[in-house]
C-alpha cells in the first residue's frame, strides 16, 4: 500500500530493529533498544515497518513479549528514536471514565497523566497495557490513543508534575474514572514474608497484587484475569499455602483512580456510593492513586455505576 502511494517501505523483525529482551519466553521484558538499522533505513528514505511483540535475548534467541507487546514495542522504539509522541491506534477512540457498555455516556478524557493512566490500566482499563504506559512514562514519551476507524478524537497520555489536569470532573478533585476486574483471588493469612513471596512468584509480579496489611495478617487481592491458566495458578497457591491462608475465588473488584485517594472527601464519596448501591464490600484496598473494593460478580456493574455517579459525575470538593 505504501509503495502504491509512491513511497518505499521495508519490513524488519524485532531482532533486526535492535529490540533486546530478557529470557522470559512468551512473556519477555524489553531490556534495551538499539535502533541502528532502523535509523539507517529511515535516513535512506524508507518507511520502516517493525514487527511488534518480539525481540531477542543476549544469546540471540527469538523471544515474544506478553500481553500488550505490540504497543510496548512501539513505545520502546519511540523512546529509543527520541520521539516526543507515539500514536497508538485501536478499535476505541481513547480513554473514557468508565466502560461505555456499563455506564451510559461516560466522559471522554482528553488528557491523562501517565502515572494515573498506569493505575487505571492495572485495575482493568483495557485501552493500553500498564507496562506500555509505564515505559512511556519512564522514557518521557507521550501516547496518543486513537481509533483506527474514527475521527481525530483521541486521549493524550503524558508525564506531568501536576496530576490535576487528568480531569474527568470539570471542577474539584481529579477522578480519572471507574474500572473493574472480573476475576480476582482474595488471600487472607499469616503476615509472613513467605506468603507474600509465594504469591508474587506464582503470579509474576507485584503489579498483580493489592495488599491490605493489618498487624498480623495479610489480605492480598490477586489479579489472575489475564494469566494464561488461572485455574492452575489457583491450584498451585492452594497447594503451596495450605492451611496458612484462606483463598476466596470468583471475586470482582471495582476501583476508582484519582489524584487524591487518601482524601477524606473521596473516602466518604466512595462509601456513600456503596451504600446507595446496597453493596457490602468483601474487602477494601488503597494505593497512592486508587481505592478498590471487592464484591460478588453480580454486584460489579451496579457498583461501577454508583461510584461513577458519586465520584465522576459529581465533583469531589476537597476541604468543603
Go through the PLM ranges and name each one.
Residues 1, 119, 135, 198-202, ...:
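Alpha-helical scaffold elements within enzyme catalytic domains, especially in hydrolases
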Residues 1-133, 225, 285, 289-299, ...:
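Nucleotide/pyrophosphate-binding catalytic subdomain
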Residues 46, 84-86, 118, 131, ...:
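Structural beta-strand/beta-sheet cores of well-ordered domains, especially the beta-sheet scaffolds
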Residues 118-188:
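A conserved active-site cap/scaffold subdomain adjacent to cofactor or substrate pockets
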Residues 156-320:
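A conserved regulatory-domain signal marking ACT and ACT-like small-molecule sensing domains
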